Amino acid sequence: MATKINVRSPFYLKVSQTNIATATLKLYIYTGTFVANASVANEKYTLTKSVVTAGFIVFEVAELIRDYLEIEFDGSYTSQVVWVNALITTTVSSGSATATVSPDNTNGFVAFDGYGYFNEGANPVLSTGLLMSNNTIFRLNDSNVRIPVYTGATTSVSFFNNGVVKRTQAVSTSTNTNAQIDYITVSGQDNNDTYQERVVADGGILESSKCLDDFLDSIDVGVVDEVYVSTADSTEVIKIESVEECKFDPIKVTFVNKFGALQDMWFFLKSVESTNIKSEQFKASIFDQSTLSYKTHQHQQQSFLTQGKDKIVMNTGYLNDDYNQVIEELLLSEQVYYTQITDTAEVVIPIIPVTKSVTYLTQLNDKLINYTIEFENAFDKINNIR
């Protein structure tokens, strides 16, 4: 199995050899099917270093790899990783000792857009099965439950309700990058979460009415209360809490978490939208010397470079302590989106967290845990793409 790399944190390769003089690293970065003998066409970098400390040379490769890892989300949950082959050759000042590389580069590497914390040490590998930190998920009533897993280690995912198995999916390993992360859902369909999304996905037109809303609030086609994620060594249990919200329109936010996987989070309560406008101004000369007059309907104070940006403030609803980690990863994420559903389309909006500081709440100290997070759209109001 390939070694995992989380490229938002440094990743070091150490080559050790008696009397080593220089080391040359060739990095092959690519998607698709893994090949042990990397093609020259996939060679992205060649680095050569001379020995500084006798006996070994160290390369840091995470930033180089991340240049070729592009994360996108358009509503589809896909595996977004890259294969890396790190081939190292050395020269020695004398002798013919064998070089060793740490971590072992024999089976190559699979790079995720994840990161480790300071206290997790160098070259953090993190979980090799479940690709999320929380063991509780708050889901909107009648919405999908989506569990991101690493297929190189996970063997199965089972969904339970009241102790009865609703669905079990076996997870298979793959040599293709498009199957390294699998998003397992209770429905078996990755991309449709709610009744509204299912209507739009089927090409229908969504008609809203109080009777229909009341009916939808009374049913739940994907109800589960536990999910078991199994590897060869252990099983992790995730508790599912279903939330019924009748007053506000819940919003689904999707972000890349610390494991480099897409993760959903519902904001159940009140949301407020606003627009901020910025512009430059100058005082124009509107006097006409030929007539010794000026037009009183003409702007003396002129605006230019006028631009706007939309913002939205969301409230999570009432959570438990387990979601403090989710909030942290959301604010640390560099790719965040929310899904907006109209009568005929499902639109994914890229956003940036404006909230840069958070005080973590606990049920012991605060009783009810609700977070208010501000976001702004990751694009200008007026199209200025050139």
Located regions from the model:
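Preference for solvent-exposed, low-hydrophobicity sequence contexts
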Residues: M1-C246
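Extracellular/virion structural assembly segments
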Residues: A2-Y12, S16-I20, T168-N178, T185-Q189, ...
